[in-house]
């Protein structure tokens, strides 16, 4: 629920017209997703109302023309005030409100672009952060340094009265830098970060921050933004950093520059309409990811040679052929990017960020089809090898795989996590889902090309599977981060073991994983898992429809009891 505000606020402050039909569907969606009891909004659609979600989505509704006296707005505003008002918002919300001029910049904890000037050997230099955080920090730091604010409007003046409990002119903005409602304080700032913020706000900024250094830092931050635009054709990594970059470029160049116009054109790719209205994706789609799994689903059903499925499968193969990333980014080392040649992105090659599991699933699908009689070889061996070369760069020292790149620093970096509403975001982490995807892709590749980098592939798989085993929880499951949650990761981990010949009959790890899933089967025969499994146990709750989790469980190597209907009470058979 925090993605749509990024786009809409960026439109408003850059004076981008919002078509009436966009405005209508945005109203429909946010009204449909308001909390049924208190009228507010949370971090996501299942979450309880928070200052973060309510302050930003209330603002969006005002920007698309909803009157402050509308009954739903009155109800939402009452909830926001009950939570303390926008002074109790987390860092990202305060930053957006400061960009609008609804809040004063003094309420925002320091975001100095000077960090980008640190030598690469510094343990906490920004290039070591997780890719999403460093891409968000770029425009955040640039605009904080400029203290840029949108042109004042009647709506902005009105929001100053609506979002805060105190009179706007009497608020001690600096005193509220660290004010946050407990509901938003998922990851409280550490003593170290609080100390650094105090030094930056009270010593560095007013006393030591000289103009030549500031200009150098701002220029380098903007150069990195420009490289991001060039490498993604102005899509940028995701729906948070992209709108922020639009505002930063608008602040520097005005409305008529190519970069600003292109950003506005491409922002539509993050939006989609469903029955409830218009909302935003976390990326510009899931095209490569979904295409790869659609191919594998047909394969698992034994239909790849069925002529009825051939037209769809051929188009899917042609799509993956077209969307393979054929080169590394320009100035790869200079802009701190991971090797990507031969890979696939989550969405498309324009966005251009290869991800370990996206590369793996697409590669498996290509191999499956191109090794099926009657399908053309659109992607030749050299391009297949390019994908393998990139996959082999993803392994971490402990054998696991992360998402976009291997970790560049340790988890201690979370001591500098300023977001407050998110944990485990400062660096890359290892994931059983990503590790499994790479293991299964390399295993399939090795069967067909046993001589290409053979020793490296075998060693990679051996170390990765060993890590999968050490990552198993005492109850037998695995914890996932890219899906909910134990069901999701256990499905992948068991697939890893199965791809190397470990089954229920011959592997204690596979047996424990299968037994774990069976122990969580519902009386109706299905499985369900609540999102609040993350981060605290117990891991399973019977609080949501079982269809999705049941499908995940049926995809695990239980000798595939997939014919069992969701309504069946017959347990799957383990052989």
Where are these predicted regions, by residue range?
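Preference for long, amphipathic alpha-helical scaffolds in soluble/luminal domains
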Residues: 1-575
């Amino acid at each position: 629920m925090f993605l749509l505000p990024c786009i809409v606020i960026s439109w408003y402050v850059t004076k981008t017209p919002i078509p009436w039909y966009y405005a209508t569907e945005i109203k429909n969606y946010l009204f449909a997703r308001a909390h049924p009891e208190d009228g507010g909004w949370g971090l996501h659609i299942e979450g309880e109302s928070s200052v973060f979600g309510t302050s930003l989505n209330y603002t969006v509704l005002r920007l698309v023309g909803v009157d402050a006296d509308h009954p739903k707005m009155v109800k939402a505003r009452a909830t926001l005030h009950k939570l303390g008002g926008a002074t109790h918002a987390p860092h990202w919300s305060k930053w957006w409100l400061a960009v609008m001029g609804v809040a004063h910049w003094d309420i925002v904890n320091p975001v100095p672009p000077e960090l980008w000037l640190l030598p690469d050997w510094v343990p906490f230099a920004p290039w070591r952060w997780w890719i999403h955080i460093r891409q968000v920090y770029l425009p955040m730091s640039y605009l904080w340094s400029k203290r840029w604010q949108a042109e004042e409007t009647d709506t902005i003046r009105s929001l100053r009265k609506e979002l805060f409990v105190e009179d706007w002119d009497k608020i001690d903005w600096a005193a509220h830098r660290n004010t946050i409602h407990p509901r938003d304080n998922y990851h409280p700032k550490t003593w170290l970060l609080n100390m650094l913020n105090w030094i930056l706000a009270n010593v560095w900024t007013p006393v030591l921050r000289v103009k030549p250094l500031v200009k150098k830092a701002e220029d380098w931050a903007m150069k990195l933004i420009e490289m991001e635009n060039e490498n993604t054709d102005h899509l940028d990594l995701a729906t948070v950093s992209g709108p922020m970059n639009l505002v930063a470029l608008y602040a520097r160049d005005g409305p008529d520059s190519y970069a600003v116009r292109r950003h506005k054109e491409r922002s539509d790719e993050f939006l989609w309409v469903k029955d409830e209205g218009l909302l935003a994706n976390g990326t510009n789609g899931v095209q490569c990811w979904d295409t790869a799994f659609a191919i594998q689903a047909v394969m698992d059903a034994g239909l790849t040679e069925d002529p009825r499925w051939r037209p769809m499968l051929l188009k899917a193969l042609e799509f993956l052929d077209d969307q393979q990333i054929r080169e590394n980014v320009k100035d790869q080392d200079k802009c701190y990017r991971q090797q990507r040649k031969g890979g696939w992105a989550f969405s498309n090659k324009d966005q251009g960020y290869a991800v370990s599991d996206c590369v793996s699933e697409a590669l498996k699908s290509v191999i499956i089809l191109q090794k099926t009689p009657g399908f053309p070889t659109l992607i030749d061996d050299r391009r297949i090898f390019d994908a393998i070369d990139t996959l082999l760069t993803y392994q971490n020292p402990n054998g696991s795989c992360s998402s976009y790149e291997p970790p560049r620093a340790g988890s201690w970096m979370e001591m500098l996590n300023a977001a407050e509403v998110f944990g485990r975001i400062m660096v890359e982490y290892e994931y059983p889902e990503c590790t499994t995807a790479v293991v299964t892709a390399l295993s399939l590749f090795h069967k067909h090309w046993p001589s290409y980098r053979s020793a490296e592939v075998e060693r990679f798989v051996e170390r990765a599977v060993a890590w999968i085993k050490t990552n198993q929880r005492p109850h037998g499951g695995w914890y996932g981060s890219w899906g909910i949650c134990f069901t999701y990761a256990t499905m992948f981990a068991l697939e890893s073991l199965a791809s190397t010949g470990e089954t229920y009959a011959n592997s204690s790890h596979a047996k424990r994983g299968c037994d774990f899933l069976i122990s969580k089967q519902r009386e109706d025969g299905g499985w369900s898992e609540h999102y609040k499994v993350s981060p605290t146990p117990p891991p399973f709750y019977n609080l949501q429809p079982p269809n999705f989790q049941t499908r995940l469980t049926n995809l695990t190597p239980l000798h595939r009891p997939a014919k069992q209907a969701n309504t069946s009470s017959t347990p799957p058979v383990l052989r």
